[in-house]
Design a protein with these regions (language model features):
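Rossmann-fold dinucleotide-binding core
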Residues: 116-186, 190-194
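NAD(P)-dependent Rossmann-like dehydrogenase/reductase catalytic/cofactor-binding core
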Residues: 2, 176-186, 209, 214-322
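Hydrophobic/aromatic beta-strand patches that form the interior of the parallel beta-sheet core
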Residues: 32, 76, 90, 140-142, ...
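A non-catalytic, amphipathic alpha-helix used as a structural packing/dimerization or gating element
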Residues: 40-50, 165-176, 216-219, 223
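NAD(P)+-binding Rossmann beta1-loop-alpha1 motif at the extreme N-terminus of oxidoreductases
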Residues: 1-54, 58, 110
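Rossmann-like NAD(P)-binding element
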Residues: 39-40, 56-117, 124
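Helix N-cap / loop-to-helix initiation motif
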Residues: 37, 62, 163, 212-216
Length: 322
C-alpha cells in the first residue's frame, strides 16, 4: 500500500466531496475532483475556488489560502484517468448502498493495486460496500463531517480485511490536513450518528411530551452541556461532574423513564471500584494527581470563558422564520 499519501482523487464534487477536496488541497496535497462527467467536475472546481476566496475574504481562511488551493486542486479528467494516478481515492457520492457500490466498483477497477480507497459514508457499514472493491485490504470508511473545511473530526472504520498500514497512512494524511481521526467499529451509524440521532430522538420526545418547546430544548443544549462538548467528550465531562453523582442521577431517571435511562453497566462498575472521577483522583478516563486536577480545572475554565467570549462576539445564530 501507499505508505505516504501525496496524491488524492475525490469522487463527487458536491458539497461534501468539494469540502473534503478543498481541505486536503489547502494542506498542500495534490487533489483532483471528478464527478458524473468532466464538465460537472470543472464547474465544481470553479465553485470551490470562488468559495475559498469568500472564506479568505471573511477571515475564515488565512491570507493566501485560495492560491494554495488553486495550485493543488484540479479537475478535467474522467474518473478512470484520475484514480489511476492517485495514492488515495475518497468516494463522496450519494448516500445509497447501490450508488456507492457502483462507483466503488469503477474506482477499484481503475485504481492502482496499492492505492487506498475510502468512502465518506455516514451510516452504511463497510461490510455492506466492500464487495464492490478489489483487494479489500485497502478499503475503509473515512467519514468527514459537514462542513468539511471547518470540522476537524473524521471517523475511520476498518473492514475485516483492512490492514493496519492502510489506517496508519490515512491517519497521517488527516494529521497533515489538521484533522483528527478516530477509529470506530463497523456498525450502522458508527459513533457520530448513533449519538447524534439518539440525542435528537430524546429531544423530540421531550417536545412530544410537552416538557419544553423545540426552541427551549435547543437553548438548553447549546448553553449547558453542548457548550462543553467542543472541549470534552461525555466520559471526560462525567469525570469532572463525579461518576457517583451520575450514577445517582441515572437512578432517579430510571425510576421515571424505565430501563432506557438505567445506569450504564460500565458506570456502575467504575463507581463500585471507587472511581468517582477527578474529585477523588480516579476517573473513567484515567487517574488524576493534584497537578493534573489543577490543569484540568484551569483548562476547563479558560476554554469555557473563551467560548463565552466567542458567542458574545458572534451573537445569536440566525433562525428560520415561522
Amino acid at each position: 500500500m501507499a505508505k505516504t499519501i501525496n496524491t488524492v482523487t475525490v469522487v463527487g464534487a458536491g458539497y461534501m466531496g468539494g469540502g473534503i477536496a478543498q481541505s486536503l488541497a489547502l494542506a498542500d496535497l495534490k487533489v483532483e475532483i471528478v464527478d458524473v462527467d468532466v464538465e460537472a467536475a470543472k464547474k465544481g472546481l470553479e465553485r470551490l475556488l470562488q468559495e475559498a476566496q469568500e472564506f479568505e475574504d471573511q477571515g475564515l481562511y488565512a491570507a493566501g489560502s485560495t492560491e494554495t488551493i488553486k495550485a493543488n486542486l484540479t479537475a478535467g479528467r474522467t474518473l478512470e484517468a484520475a484514480v489511476a494516478e492517485s495514492d488515495f481515492i475518497e468516494e463522496a457520492v450519494f448516500e445509497s448502498p447501490e450508488v456507492k457500490r457502483e462507483v466503488l466498483g469503477k474506482i477499484s477497477e481503475h485504481a492502482r493495486e496499492d492505492a487506498i480507497i475510502g468512502t465518506n459514508t455516514s451510516t452504511i457499514p463497510v461490510h455492506v460496500l466492500v464487495s464492490a472493491v478489489k483487494h479489500p485490504e485497502r478499503f475503509l470508511t473515512v467519514h468527514f463531517s459537514n462542513p468539511a473545511p471547518f470540522i476537524p473530526g473524521v471517523e475511520l472504520v476498518s473492514g475485516v480485511a483492512t490492514t493496519p498500514d492502510v489506517v496508519d497512512a490515512v491517519k497521517d494524511l488527516l494529521a497533515r490536513a489538521g484533522r483528527e481521526g478516530a477509529e470506530v467499529a463497523d456498525t450502522p451509524g458508527m459513533v457520530l450518528n448513533r449519538l447524534q440521532y439518539a440525542l435528537l430522538k430524546e429531544a423530540a420526545s421531550v417536545v412530544e411530551e410537552g416538557i419544553a418547546t423545540a426552541e427551549d430544548v435547543d437553548t438548553v443544549v447549546r448553553t449547558t452541556f453542548g457548550f462543553r462538548l467542543g472541549f470534552f467528550g461525555p466520559f471526560a465531562i462525567a469525570d469532572q461532574a463525579g461518576l457517583d453523582v451520575y450514577a445517582n442521577g441515572f437512578n432517579t431517571l430510571s425510576e421515571a423513564y424505565g430501563e432506557r435511562l438505567a445506569p450504564p453497566k460500565l458506570l456502575e462498575e467504575n463507581v463500585a471500584a471507587g472511581r468517582h472521577g477527578v474529585k477523588n483522583g480516579k476517573g473513567w478516563t484515567g487517574d488524576f494527581d493534584d497537578e493534573t486536577k489543577a490543569e484540568v480545572i484551569a483548562y476547563r475554565n479558560k476554554a469555557y470563558a473563551r467560548m463565552g467570549d466567542l458567542l458574545r462576539e458572534l451573537g445569536p445564530a440566525p433562525k428560520g422564520k415561522k
